């Protein structure tokens, strides 16, 4: 192609996503607030006004109070229309019945954010589906965002904003906390004030009519004042958007959820058949864990974990080394931690030798007595931190006559820059307040007991561990496996067209066999005589999260199956192992068999997950398998289909979108060389580094409109996000060539499509290697992205290119784009409508 580099500006900043997050600025960062008193009897309107006025809000505030005398010290108006300036946030105490009219007034006056407080504190104000539908219709395409109805309110302590129903102002901090339950919100606030825990934002959202979990997670993910996000989730709402947002944000900020719902005893009482009839807490837990969210058991662990993750490095492994200055407490702490499942690290021989030389007596790390000096204790602590056998250190300090807590704390500050997490527990520490304060100021967390510290360390490790799995991109098919999909799909379609809602035993066995799962056919009597353990694998369709996988032991009781591990498809071997590890039954198998012997079970689960992702017309699939040291054999199966009258568009969508292998295909460039066009994967990062290394300065300048260092373009933090995409938000298609002699792969072009928050528009961008420009790649990549946009239901595609990039302007024109010129920005803007 003639003229310029075949480069289109890539929207790396994800401008649309940021604008979506910024839509909540009117709620959490308003410049003007109107407090609307609706005059409901027994409503806490006066308390809300008083609380707000005493909060020290830094912006402008008004009171809307029809037919009443002005509140002291306020600017009071009878109507919202009387306010002389634009209102960012309106706070109203209103019943569910009155809410539609109140919201309509706010929308009419272009209020950015609305908080609808409940007139009855501590309760959700029930409202009819008709009222909810009416409010959604009123909101329509407006820019007004609503928290509530039935909310307890929101706070932004750093701004002095207290838009709640009479709650005291929270302390400022770095944790954003959001809950649904008003009662839990009050408990958390009281706890935080008692324990001096601060918030960047605090919100009790009530009935989430408008603002969703995804909106909130996106917002706090971009909030510079928030380091950690803490949530209490009772209902997931739009599960796919929740998982999508959590997946995006958890890479950079920890998201911690208070465990709620079924306890272990209640979960075990569920029958296998009823397990996934609705979204119980275990399904929600499995979904959140899949995207790197941490779940904890209570308020203490929630904020202790949030604090530790914001101050300490994440552990690289599960091994925690205990260092104590007293023998009895040290032994008791070690026993307690071991019972809690903490993996205690054993010091290396070199560390043991150095400790003996230092103390010159028979001491161990859990009994560092020596002469009781702070110097000895800190010296041993340094040895523990540097020991290669540990991933974190818990320092247990017991005040005793010969010890100086303040001096010990001062010397321990030398460990503040450790690459491993350092946690400290003071026992019986009535007189160590100043020592603990010094450590806390130095970002070294202290705990009242080693058990709490151990749980926090486990949560920190789980966060690191789950983040590793985020970069796993399961591939649904290898090339050539589409025949399997088509065969099974036709089998299911024929069964449904004949009015059946289930497959026969022979057909169920055929489905398993087609996906590479060994079976003994429909005849259970044909099971070979071999040693093994029976296990149950299941597939259920959850109304919110789509297909859900289950694995557990076969219980010969009255239809009850205990110890069920739950996961979401699709899986690869690593993700399958992560799912299996949640089962005590599987951990028992590990003790009985060698780890390598259970690879067949992982492969079995991976293939079974492909069925779940590949065949959405299946509603339930149960398989009883025989696990032996060498393989897994399906000995019986039952497959239930969605009812014949159920339309495909009415089926629940999967929470985790699989790798879109349907967009993989070869293509020939003008020079005759064949490239493979495929969606980008997380493991493409090394190839992307080489791709950027080969770009000329001119191409880089045309791409970024400025000179950008190679080190900036190839930084891991940037490229990992480019390669690790959520296909519900962004799509990247690359062109890859293979060396016929070495079989080495090389990326020669990358094209992206970034969806708008409303999923109505996609912005296209293309970047092509210098040696492959003018080969037709730009046109073909854009053509394929247009096809993807149509498949996703987008209404239009837009792009921008520089004035002198004539080649891409021609490409856009030939593909049907309408071109316009932006002389101020020196750009050609291209728009293609997909509605026709």
Where are these regions (language model features)?
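A structural signal for short, well-ordered beta-strand segments
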Residues: 537, 623-625, 637-639, 764, ...
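Charge-rich, low-complexity terminal tails
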Residues: 517, 625-648, 750, 834
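Catalytic-core regions of core metabolic enzymes
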Residues: 2-636
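Short clusters of small/polar residues that mark proteolytic maturation junctions
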Residues: 204, 637-638, 679, 752
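Long, contiguous binding/interaction regions
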Residues: 643-836
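A short local loop/turn or secondary-structure capping micro-motif enriched for an aromatic residue
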Residues: 354, 545, 557-559, 642-644, ...
């Amino acid at each position: 192609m003639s003229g310029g580099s075949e480069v289109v500006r890539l929207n790396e900043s994800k401008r649309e996503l940021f604008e979506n997050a910024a839509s909540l600025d009117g709620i959490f960062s308003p410049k003007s607030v109107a407090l609307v008193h609706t005059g409901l009897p027994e409503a806490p309107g006066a308390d809300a006004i008083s609380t707000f006025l005493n909060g020290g809000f830094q912006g402008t505030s008004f009171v809307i109070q029809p037919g009443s005398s002005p509140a002291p010290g306020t600017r009071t108006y009878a109507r919202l229309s009387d306010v002389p300036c634009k209102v960012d946030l309106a706070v109203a105490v209103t019943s569910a019945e009155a809410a539609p009219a109140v919201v309509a007034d706010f929308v009419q006056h272009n209020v950015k954010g609305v908080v609808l407080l409940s007139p009855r504190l501590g309760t959700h104000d029930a409202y009819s589906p008709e009222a909810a539908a009416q409010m959604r219709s009123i909101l329509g395409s407006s820019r007004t965002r609503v928290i509530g109805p039935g909310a307890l309110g929101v706070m932004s302590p750093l701004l002095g904003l207290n838009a709640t129903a009479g709650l005291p102002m929270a302390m400022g901090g770095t944790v954003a906390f959001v809950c649904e339950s008003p009662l839990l919100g009050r408990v958390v606030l009281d706890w935080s004030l008692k324990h001096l825990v601060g918030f960047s934002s605090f919100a009790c959202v009530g009935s989430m009519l408008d603002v969703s979990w995804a909106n909130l997670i996106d917002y706090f993910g971009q909030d510079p004042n928030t380091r950690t996000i803490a949530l209490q989730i009772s209902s997931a709402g739009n599960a796919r958007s929740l998982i999508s947002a959590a997946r995006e944000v958890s890479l950079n900020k920890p998201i911690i959820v208070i465990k709620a719902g079924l306890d272990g005893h209640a979960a075990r009482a569920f029958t296998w058949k009823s397990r996934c009839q609705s979204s119980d807490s275990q399904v929600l837990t499995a979904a959140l864990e899949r995207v790197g969210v941490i779940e904890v058991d209570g308020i203490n662990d929630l904020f202790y974990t949030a604090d530790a993750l914001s101050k300490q490095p994440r552990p690289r492994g599960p091994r925690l080394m205990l260092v104590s200055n007293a023998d009895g407490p040290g032994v008791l702490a070690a026993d307690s931690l071991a019972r809690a499942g903490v993996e205690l690290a054993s010091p290396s021989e070199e560390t043991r030798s150095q400790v003996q030389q230092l103390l010159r007596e028979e001491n161990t790390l859990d009994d560092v007595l020596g002469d009781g000096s702070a110097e000895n204790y800190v010296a041993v602590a340094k040895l523990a931190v540097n020991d290669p056998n540990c991933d974190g250190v818990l320092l247990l300090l017991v005040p005793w006559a010969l010890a100086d807590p303040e001096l010990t704390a001062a010397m321990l500050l030398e460990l503040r820059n450790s690459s491993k997490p350092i946690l400290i527990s003071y026992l019986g520490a009535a007189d160590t307040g100043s020592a603990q304060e010094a450590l806390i100021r130095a970002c070294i967390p202290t705990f009242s007991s080693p058990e709490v510290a151990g749980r926090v360390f486990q949560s920190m490790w789980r966060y690191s561990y789950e983040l590793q799995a985020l970069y796993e991109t399961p591939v649904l098919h290898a090339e050539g496996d589409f025949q399997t999909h088509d065969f099974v799909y036709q089998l299911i379609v024929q069964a449904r067209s004949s009015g059946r809602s289930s497959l026969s035993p022979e057909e169920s066995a055929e489905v398993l066999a087609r996906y590479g799962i060994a079976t003994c056919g429909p005849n259970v009597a044909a099971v070979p005589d071999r040693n093994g353990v029976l296990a149950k694998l299941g597939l259920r369709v959850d109304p919110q999260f789509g297909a859900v996988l289950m694995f557990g032991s076969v219980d010969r009781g009255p239809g009850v199956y205990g110890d069920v591990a739950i996961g979401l498809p699709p899986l690869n071997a690593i993700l399958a192992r992560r799912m299996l590890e949640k089962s005590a039954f599987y951990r028992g198998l590990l003790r009985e068999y060698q780890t390598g012997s259970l690879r067949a079970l992982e492969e079995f689960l991976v293939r079974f997950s492909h069925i779940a992702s590949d065949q959405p017309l299946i509603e339930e699939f149960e398989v009883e398998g025989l696990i032996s040291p060498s393989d897994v054999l399906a000995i019986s199966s039952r497959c239930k289909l969605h009812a014949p009258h159920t339309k495909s568009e009415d089926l629940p969508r999967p929470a985790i979108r699989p790798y879109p292998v349907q967009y993989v295909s070869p293509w020939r460039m003008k020079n005759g060389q064949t490239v493979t066009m495929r969606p980008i994967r997380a493991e493409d990062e090394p190839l992307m580094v080489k791709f950027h290394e080969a770009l000329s300065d001119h191409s880089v300048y045309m791409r970024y409109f400025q000179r950008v260092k190679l080190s900036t373009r190839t930084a891991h933090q940037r490229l990992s996000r480019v390669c690790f995409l959520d296909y519900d938000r962004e799509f990247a298609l690359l062109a890859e060539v293979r060396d016929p002699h070495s079989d080495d792969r090389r990326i020669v072009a990358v094209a992206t499509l970034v969806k708008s928050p409303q999923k109505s528009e996609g912005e296209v961008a293309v970047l092509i290697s210098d040696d492959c420009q003018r080969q037709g790649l730009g046109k073909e990549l854009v053509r394929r992205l247009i096809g993807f946009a149509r498949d996703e239901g987008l209404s239009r595609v837009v792009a921008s290119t520089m004035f002198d990039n004539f080649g891409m302007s021609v490409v856009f024109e030939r593909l049907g784009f309408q071109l316009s010129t932006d002389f101020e920005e020196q750009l050609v803007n291209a728009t293609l409508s997909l509605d026709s």
